[in-house]
């Protein structure tokens, strides 16, 4: 029974969302913007994980439209170029365990990164975001739990105007008796 519930829990979606490129500009500034943003998404995972699960990634494609792709290799990369501002930038993934797969914390070896180039009025924003490997997630970094029914993704500007990016991931430490997975919010 525990294995069935554990497997079912892994079907939850681990969502990661950044922000909008240029969403803070007013209409006058929008006319002066070099209207281009480039995002390169990369997901690296272990062969053990690929063998144990079906991994489906959803990313914000051209125009901010959600595009889904199934990952079958240990490295997946996608570059999206937009000629509009603002544009939504985001990435999420879903894990679906394969039949008879033996999934442990060490199997959850996945790291997502993305590089953002957002051309705006004053300067060019180049931001590189690196999400930790799931299996290396320390209990000391565990932040506020999110309500699964009312889960909201958010981000906040730092003092320098850059975005502090919350990373919502599945935290193995939250399994407890093996019957429950929860969303966790991690910040460096």
What are these regions (language model features)?
Residues 1-9:
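Bacterial N-terminal signal peptides that target proteins for export
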Residues 4, 15-40:
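Bacterial Sec-dependent N-terminal signal peptides
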Residues 31-188:
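First exposed extracellular module after export/assembly in secreted or surface-exposed proteins
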Residues 10-14:
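Core hydrophobic alpha-helical transmembrane segments of single-pass membrane proteins
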């Amino acid at each position: 029974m525990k294995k069935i519930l554990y497997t079912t829990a892994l079907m939850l979606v681990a969502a990661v969302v950044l922000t909008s490129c240029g969403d803070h500009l007013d209409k006058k500034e929008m006319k002066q913007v070099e209207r281009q943003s480039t995002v390169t998404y990369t997901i690296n995972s272990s062969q053990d994980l690929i063998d144990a699960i079906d991994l489906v990634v959803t990313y914000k494609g051209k125009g901010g439209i959600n595009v889904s792709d199934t990952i079958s290799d240990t490295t997946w990369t996608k570059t999206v170029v937009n000629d509009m501002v603002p544009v939504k930038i985001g990435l999420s993934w879903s894990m679906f365990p394969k039949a008879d797969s033996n999934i442990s914390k060490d199997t959850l070896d996945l790291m997502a990164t993305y590089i953002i180039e957002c051309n705006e009025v004053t300067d060019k924003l180049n931001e590189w975001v690196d999400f930790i490997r799931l299996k290396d997630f320390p209990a000391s970094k565990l932040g506020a739990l999110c309500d699964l029914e009312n889960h909201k993704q958010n981000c906040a500007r730092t003092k320098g105007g850059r975005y502090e990016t919350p990373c919502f991931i599945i935290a193995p430490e939250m399994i407890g008796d093996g019957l429950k997975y929860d969303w966790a919010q991690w910040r460096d």
